[in-house]
Amino acid sequence: MTNVVVVGSQWGDEGKGKIVDWLSERADIVVRFQGGHNAGHTLVIDGTSYKLSLLPSGVVRPGKMAVIGNGVVVDPHALIAEIEKLSAQGVTITPDNLRIADNATLILSLHRELDAMREDAASNSGTKIGTTRRGIGPAYEDKVGRRAIRVMDLADLDSLPGKVDRILTHHNALRRGLGVAEVSHQTIMDELTSVAERVLPFRDTVWLFLDKERRKGARILFEGAQGSLLDIDHGTYPFVTSSNTVAGQAAAGSGMGPGSLGYILGITKAYTTRVGEGPFPTELTDEIGQFLGEKGHEFGTVTGRKRRCGWFDAALVRQSVATNGITGIALTKLDVLDGLEELKICVGYMLDGEQIDHLPASQGAQARVEPIYVTLEGWKESTVGARSWADLPAQAIKYVRQVEELIGAPVALLSTSPERDDTILVTDPFED
């Protein structure tokens, strides 16, 4: 028996929600360890769709404990709204099935406002990142700057005013520079005190809770948000998110030691998508790209933004296998490729006349790379709902094997539709 860390191996939107839900039946605890409510996923259970963006996937399954770790930035208003929305769908959420790290950073209204102001200014200069404008980045900045308001601070009204003064000293200086009205001390105090009673019942010393449960033999599933190529260090900087999204963050963002993380499962889409700005070597702007977007329903769960689509990039996923220490992958949306006469897989790049096997870190070099492809024959038969290798066309199996060989990691799970049971299990990560 082992614990499992689930990470996206591309630019997010790989189908982590379904896989995490599928694995959560085998887990006792599901932990979010980074990001905020900027990355959403949809779970389909018995025909009912649940849209989550902050809460761990395990929260919709009875008998599971959901944990929001210290690596997550928590918007208390978004948290309350998501709890209320799920409650209206019949999901019970109490401290018996949800814990929030007392040292997790809070997202405030001033973070959202700063995020939007920066994006607007960057749009005018052509340098926008394409954030969700939800305050994620500014909240992480305050965390690193040691001026953040944390969950535990809601319980200490004696020291809270001084902490509000500290964060406002920074933000009001920024707002003056941007020509925007300053935020009053009372506005932030009112904002925090209005949510305290709703948030504080869920707070816990998460690292201690997880350590005790681990020692009792609990199976723990760590749920990553976004994808490895959006990692603040290892992604396509500066077009990245504001946190570490690789598997190592599961330890830092939960307080559990890295030796206890276990199996690293990389969720990998059978083609490539990206939301927002940034390099995308295999992007298709032709009818095939449109086909992938329409058939794959490539629109963001949180923002509704249309995703850019392209061929599978084995060079990029190979990079993610290395930076995450991926044990095996879950290959998703294979069924979207049904009907294409031929398929291409990127195996490397040409850069200034030289062949390279990885995407360079330099923004300028990333813009100049040209993908090198291998071409495979497609298949006409449907793979939708396949639950065994015998259900797959020969060419689909060949495609999967080619992916495994090129990225240097085996397929542990294969997903053939949004339905959780339409999954081919090769290796159970919890039993590895």
UniProtKB/Swiss-Prot annotation:
The active site is at residues 13, 41. GTP binds at residues 12-18, 40-42, 307, 333-335, 415-417. Its EC number is 6.3.4.4. GO terms for molecular function: adenylosuccinate synthase activity; GTP binding; magnesium ion binding. CDD domains: AdSS. PROSITE patterns: ADENYLOSUCCIN_SYN_1 (PS01266), ADENYLOSUCCIN_SYN_2 (PS00513). Pfam families: Adenylsucc_synt (PF00709). SUPFAM superfamilies: P-loop containing nucleoside triphosphate hydrolases. Its cofactor is Mg(2+). IMP binds at residues 13-16, 38-41, 132, 146, 226, 241, 305. Mg(2+) binds at residues 13, 40. GO terms for cellular component: cytoplasm. Pathway: Purine metabolism; AMP biosynthesis via de novo pathway; AMP from IMP: step 1/2. Substrate binds at residues 301-307. Signal peptide: none annotated. It is found in: Cytoplasm. Binds 1 Mg(2+) ion per subunit. Homodimer. Belongs to the adenylosuccinate synthetase family. Plays an important role in the de novo pathway of purine nucleotide biosynthesis. Catalyzes the first committed step in the biosynthesis of AMP from IMP. This is Adenylosuccinate synthetase.
